[in-house]
Amino acid sequence: MGDYVVVLEAPIIVRDVETSEDAINVAVSKVAKALNKEKLDFVRVEIGYSQCPVCGAHFESAFVIGSVGLVGMYLTIKVYNAQTIEHAERIAKAVIGKALKKVPLKVYEIRELTEEEEGEGVEFEE
């Protein structure tokens, strides 16, 4: 049994926004509200970053077209007592997916939990 940090990518669509800052604020609020409703306040929510194909600079993954925004977000959760990395991935997707219905979740990163990172998370019990 292992302990893992799982980072998932999630595209969040928001409506009635004018700027990318508005889109980010609404998306963070929308995700936080959904997670808190399921008592998942220990999930860390961060804005995703994209890389410019020309210059290589990083920028926030928030795009607005016609008052509709698309915001890329990273959701980080700690999973305890998972049998394998794949098991940790399934647990993370199930837990976060329950709160964010109809939002596709893709694994961005999975790594073993270090002693400094231990804290609140999801524990799997057989």
Swiss-Prot record:
A Pfam family that the UniProt record links to this protein: DUF555
InterPro entries: UPF0212
Similarity section: Belongs to the UPF0212 family.
Protein name as catalogued: UPF0212 protein TON_0350
Species for this entry: Thermococcus onnurineus (strain NA1)
